[in-house]
Amino acid sequence: FVELARKGFYDGLKFHRHVPGFVIQGGCPNTRDLTPEEVVKKAGNPFAGLGTGGPGYSIKEEFSTNPNNKHLDGSLAMARSQDPNSAGSQFYLCLGAQPMLDSGYTVFGQTIDGMDVIGQLRVGDVIESVEIENAAE
């Protein structure tokens, strides 16, 4: 995530999934060339290709080796397919604590300020840029 963010991978992508009280998800490169309105229109169609894109590689899961893997309100975590080792570029922010995800999805960040902004994010909203602070290398 940090490497992709520093390369500008996320710049201009749109959030493509919002489940109130659960998560807001982004990071799918298939949203890059779509307008926000097109993303909103396609978001309800499971065959539209949203949520299926990635950076061309996948990341091994880390939730099984991280005792602090807790999905709290504002946690930043890697989205993936059914394969635990399939995470790539897609991420989600928790909209409330989601402990049922702790044993299956890797948390790698925590929102420390701006939860009011996260709560207002919706499908089609544009990721202008991602700024990394205090990242472990």
Question: Where does each model-flagged region fall?
Answer:
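Cyclophilin-like peptidyl-prolyl cis-trans isomerases
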Residues: 2-137
